[in-house]
């Protein structure tokens, strides 16, 4: 077994991360020693009786900002635990958009500290002095960085060897090949007069492989055509995609 992925999280709502630590794939990874998740609450590093972590922004404007001192002290505490050279990531709408390539890049780390902001964000001086990278999960605004942090943890954890039940599961996920996943079916064979495609019941592994590849190509062409344009398709993929497009045009 390799070194576990060690994740430190800076958050005002540590309890939210029980969704990661107690359930599903990530919860199992923690139980098996493949992943650790520790949370530091900036409120624990305040020095006033109100445990103040936010204040009004200079220059005016709506909302509040997370203050420097509690946030920096929480980051330093996380670094003391995980290592001073642990990269610090801020989950932010201004960050680089997280995709499969980004997840693969992040999976090369065995430690990381994630800052889950709240209110209108965090003081820019924290970003400039302590943050190594900013990542976003999409072009929209959430109430805080906790959900994006959990998304990142879940996505990266899936690439840790041994986390998924089947060794090929991560390799066959959507986007691992640059394509969307093919359709999947389980029992019963017929439901509401809809039948499982006969090829999946044939037992012919080569035909099944080609069908799945063609369906994956076709779904990507229909739903995310920009992904197709960014790929250098093999001769087989070109042939299968052209067959799929012809079938669509003929209404099959």
From Swiss-Prot:
Its EC number is 2.1.1.228. Disulfide bonds: none annotated. S-adenosyl-L-methionine binds at residues 117, 137-142. One of its GO terms (cellular component) is cytosol. Gene3D superfamilies: 3.40.1280.10, tRNA(m1g37)methyltransferase, domain 2. CDD domains: TrmD-like. It is an enzyme of class 2 (transferase). It is found in: Cytoplasm. NCBIfam families: PRK00026.1, trmD. Belongs to the RNA methyltransferase TrmD family. Homodimer. Specifically methylates guanosine-37 in various tRNAs. This is tRNA (guanine-N(1)-)-methyltransferase.
